[in-house]
């Protein structure tokens, strides 16, 4: 499976299981806010930022679960949680219409020319 298919499938699955209901409500409010006021538009932007932050924290929770898999010497759980991390990232990219494959390629190209350990100690 390629990255584009992964993003599409992960997002569709998350959406079908209710993980984007908040975003859909925000978009409905956004459509109404356009006709209401600048304050309404500002609130929609804040709500979208909060929804993105929630999804980022879900990614962090999967990272924590992967760590626990290692701490408990459960390599199968660790592998499963790594998959969850990628799925959540792909879902977020799909929901925000980010071309994740392009972003990954650009970042990998950028990293080729960075200093050893990117100039840091570790």
What are these regions (language model features)?
Residues 1-82, 86-122:
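Flexible "arm" and connector segments at domain edges
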């Amino acid at each position: 499976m390629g990255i584009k298919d992964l993003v599409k499938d992960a997002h569709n699955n998350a959406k079908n299981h209710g993980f984007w209901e908040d975003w859909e409500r925000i978009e409905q409010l956004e459509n109404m806010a356009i006709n209401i006021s600048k304050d309404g538009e500002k609130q929609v932007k804040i709500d979208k930022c909060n929804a993105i932050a929630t999804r980022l924290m879900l990614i962090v929770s999967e990272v924590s679960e992967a760590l626990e898999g290692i701490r408990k010497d459960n390599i199968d759980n660790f592998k499963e949680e790594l998959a969850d991390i990628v799925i959540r990232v792909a879902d977020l990219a799909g929901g925000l219409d980010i071309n994740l494959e392009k972003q990954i390629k650009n970042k990998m190209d950028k990293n080729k020319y960075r200093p050893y350990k990117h100039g840091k100690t570790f």
